[in-house]
Amino acid sequence: LLIGLIRHGQTDWNLIGKIQGRTDIPLNENGRNQAKLLADRLARDMFTWDYVISSGLQRAEETASIIANALHVPLLPPDERIIERSYGQVEGTTQEERMTRWGDQWRERDLGQETNEEVRARAMQFLQDMSEQHSNANILMVSHGSFLAQLYLALFQERYQENIKNLSFTVLEKKDLHWSPILYNCTRHLEESNV
């Protein structure tokens, strides 16, 4: 079983550093182009993919749709377990606004955001269910930066600490009971095109 993990393409809020969380912001034109570049890469890749699944937020759904159409594979119904972390009061704020309102310890304050443990629990449940329901399939999952970061922490503890980039591609392989990264946070498809 392989799972390809993709962070959605760029949005206007990504450009200005606003936390999106569950706010349903669409891709911008650059984000759509990024998704097409990744789809082109996946069409030429050594792996074959059977399904694409995404969260229910439009930035992930549109990214997933572009990829599924290009690869001619089914797009599964959205799964709410892979939605971005809820950031509560922090959603829609820039770094400067967060610092002004709550100081540099805003992450430690109770501002209504979902905890790391809650995000990790639903991430691991999703992986478990996918490995049981689709044990002989290779699945592409389009999700969100904070969700993916927490998934990697749940699986690999502190080994992977890079910022998860828009349209980054990670491949995890499950052998026996263990997940191993074959590729991590790769954006080669964007760098080759300077997007």
For every predicted segment, state its role.
Residues 2, 7-73:
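Active-site-proximal alpha-helix that buttresses catalytic centers in soluble enzyme cores
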Residues 3, 137-146:
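Generic beta-sheet signal
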Residues 11, 147-148:
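Short active-site segment of divalent metal-dependent hydrolases/proteases
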Residues 38-44, 73, 78, 84-96, ...:
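Acidic, low-complexity terminal tails and accessory targeting/binding regions
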Residues 45-48, 130-137:
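Glycine-rich phosphate-binding loop signature in dinucleotide/nucleotide-binding domains
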Residues 54-55, 121, 142-143:
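Short beta-strand scaffold positions
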Residues 99-118:
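Short glycine/proline- and acidic residue-enriched helix-loop micro-motifs
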